[in-house]
């Protein structure tokens, strides 16, 4: 379904007039299957968030292609309504002048639905993410971090996408809230039969929600492994990264 084909990305290194470039992603190839949760695990600076931006078409690769059902995600029509994203910084993800209802409805503006249909959908989505209907007219400054992220998840789900990219989506939340959001994501995945790309540095969270893990290091894939076979990882780096979770 979502296929990354020999993708690379560089950024300019040094001053304005420097011609030197830094390799951030190098020859990345993998697939996220329909209905699965694929974890992309790596330390800060490994390039995993850059990869996330390529998956949703925010940035373009220097070479290679990101395909969704065989079509390039650089074409907005390919990803519109079919690929959504939830990012780490939930506070800047929603326009502070929007009510919760306006924020959730933002991706639906092109769908020619009636006001009644849209309002009914907002109520349904709020219920699914564990927020009361009364939150429709609230603004984000009135909500807790966990509540704002639930609104972001409701917005991402609103178009009933086939795939959601979750880039450190729980890392800014209190530990007590993280598990609640993970359980919510699991439930929504079943309801809508979606795929997730779960980008994180949190090994335990990834092991809880993912079907497969892709270990990322220095802009390259170190190893891909099924979660039930984590003990069988071959890479020395992968074993080191998983030490907090598994005794080898």
Model-found features: residue ranges?
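Conserved catalytic motifs of ABC-family nucleotide-binding domains
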Residues: 160
């Amino acid at each position: 379904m979502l296929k990354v084909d020999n993708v690379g990305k560089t950024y300019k290194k040094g001053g304005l007039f420097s011609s030197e470039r830094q390799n951030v992603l190098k020859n990345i190839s993998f697939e996220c299957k329909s209905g699965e949760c694929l974890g992309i695990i790596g330390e800060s600076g490994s390039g995993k968030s850059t990869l996330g931006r390529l998956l949703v078409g925010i940035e373009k690769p220097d070479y290679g292609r990101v395909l969704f059902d065989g079509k390039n995600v650089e074409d907005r029509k390919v990803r519109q309504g079919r690929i959504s994203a939830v990012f780490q910084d939930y506070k800047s993800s929603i326009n502070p002048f929007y009510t919760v209802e306006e924020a959730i409805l933002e991706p639906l503006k092109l769908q020619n639905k009636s006001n009644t249909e849209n309002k009914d959908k907002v109520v349904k989505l709020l219920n699914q993410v564990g927020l009361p209907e009364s939150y429709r007219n609230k603004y984000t400054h009135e909500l807790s971090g966990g509540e704002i992220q639930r609104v972001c998840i409701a917005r991402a789900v609103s178009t009933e996408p086939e795939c959601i990219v979750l880039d450190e989506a729980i890392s800014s939340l209190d530990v007590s809230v993280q598990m609640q959001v993970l359980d919510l994501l699991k439930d929504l995945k079943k309801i809508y039969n979606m795929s997730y790309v779960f980008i994180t540095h949190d090994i335990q969270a990834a092991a809880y929600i993912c079907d497969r893990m892709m270990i990322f290091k220095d802009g390259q894939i170190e190893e891909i492994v099924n979660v039930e076979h984590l003990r069988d990882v071959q890479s020395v780096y992968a074993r080191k990264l998983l030490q907090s979770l598994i005794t080898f």
